Regions:
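Ligand-binding pockets and gating/stacking loops
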Residues: 1-367
Length: 367
């Protein structure tokens, strides 16, 4: 693992964002052959098809937001079921959402809600594995640790499909996971499944970035002086050999073939350093996204996609208020969770649109 702190689809003329949403949504429900990896593989092998979507940003709401408090308020249900929030109209006639996501309400013509996604598990751990891999965990209704025989996450599958091309041009990774809870230990002292490559092997893990982009000292890569020293060596493996006592814990890198070359390219690539440098963004734009882990994560996701990364997952930060709201549900939603999500998600859509990238970028919001 590299870790740094019923209508027929159009063919010849390309695939629209809504068609991608429809087909990609089926893959997220676990239907074989219709997921994002298959679509990307088709993009690479079927030259007669020229899909418009070139990248995907996954917004993963850690803790599982309740649909009756967000997108589908169940206005006809009993009060005990529907909660205290009121629906508001969107800019699409007949579509309503919760009152605390007003920005997204005015962008409803830009996204498609899939309200039929469900799963039979009653624990967060295996449910996350299901949502992020498309496959039910072999131990349903439990809280298992991440294991080597888990099914891989979507980013890992994409890395595997592009075997030999795990890094995009200029040393950029193919798949990145931001604010990664995969690096964080749960209350039960284990690491959650669903975020890793599983049985594909650690070399296909996404690039995990656990440091938050809203921190003033955000620096997911080593200082440039350190990278230059690495660049001056003939290979990263030689650097490991010369500092074997200090880097003994990384000896397993040799088992991954060209994996150490990926690490070397990541550390020394100017393009990677530029892509992660959110300080290059204008202060007003950063403020539009919101100075939160999620908001700045969305901004960084846009920068990465703009630079050539194919799949970026922005995980909701679990050390802050997150979506598993068994206590003080309504206050947390209206004071923190929904406003921060509404701000970051809506700005991401508008920013991509302003840059002419929205039709080529699939955004998937789920939890």
């Amino acid at each position: 693992m590299i870790t740094i702190s019923g209508q027929p689809l159009r063919t010849c003329e390309g695939v629209t964002r809504r068609e991608w949403l429809r087909v990609g949504g089926l893959g997220w429900m676990g239907l074989p052959g219709l997921g994002l990896p298959a679509l990307w593989q088709g993009h690479a092998t079927a030259s007669e098809h020229k899909p418009r979507a070139k990248a995907c940003i996954v917004l993963f709401m850690f803790g599982a937001p309740a649909h009756q408090d967000t997108w589908d308020l169940k206005t006809n249900a009993p009060s005990a079921v529907r909660g205290e929030f009121q629906p508001i109209s969107t800019n699409v006639p007949g579509i309503q959402v919760g009152e605390h996501i007003p920005r997204l309400a005015q962008l409803a013509d830009r996204y498609l809600q899939i309200r039929s996604v469900t799963h039979p598990d009653n624990t967060h751990t295996v449910a996350m594995h299901y949502m992020l891999s498309g496959v039910r965990h072999r131990r349903p209704a439990t809280n298992p640790q991440n294991a080597a025989d888990d099914f891989p996450c979507f980013g890992a599958v994409l890395n595997h499909v592009r075997r030999g091309h795990a890094l995009a041009t200029d040393g950029l990774p193919t798949s990145v996971s931001l604010n990664a809870p995969a690096n964080q230990v749960s209350a039960n002292n284990h690491i959650f499944p669903g975020f890793f490559a599983g049985f594909l092997g650690q070399e296909f893990d996404p690039l995990f970035v656990s440091q938050h982009a809203n921190r003033p000292d955000f620096q997911p890569l080593p200082p440039i002086e350190s990278s230059q020293r690495l660049f001056d060596r003939r290979s990263l493996l030689a650097q490991f050999d010369q500092q074997s006592a200090h880097l003994q814990q990384l000896a397993s890198v040799r088992d991954f073939g060209g994996y150490h070359e990926q690490a070397f390219q990541l550390l020394t690539s100017p393009a990677v350093r530029r892509a992660f440098d959110v300080t290059q963004e204008p202060a007003p734009l950063r403020a539009r996204y919101g100075q939160t882990p999620f908001g700045q994560g969305c901004l960084l996701a846009r920068r990465l996609v703009e630079s050539g990364v194919s799949l970026v997952t922005v995980n909701w930060e679990r050390d802050d208020a997150y979506w598993d709201t068994h206590a003080d549900n309504f206050n947390l939603h209206k004071q923190k969770l929904l406003p921060n999500m509404d701000q970051g998600f809506s700005t991401l859509q508008l920013d991509l649109e302003e840059r002419g990238m929205l039709d080529e970028t699939l955004i998937v919001w789920l939890g």
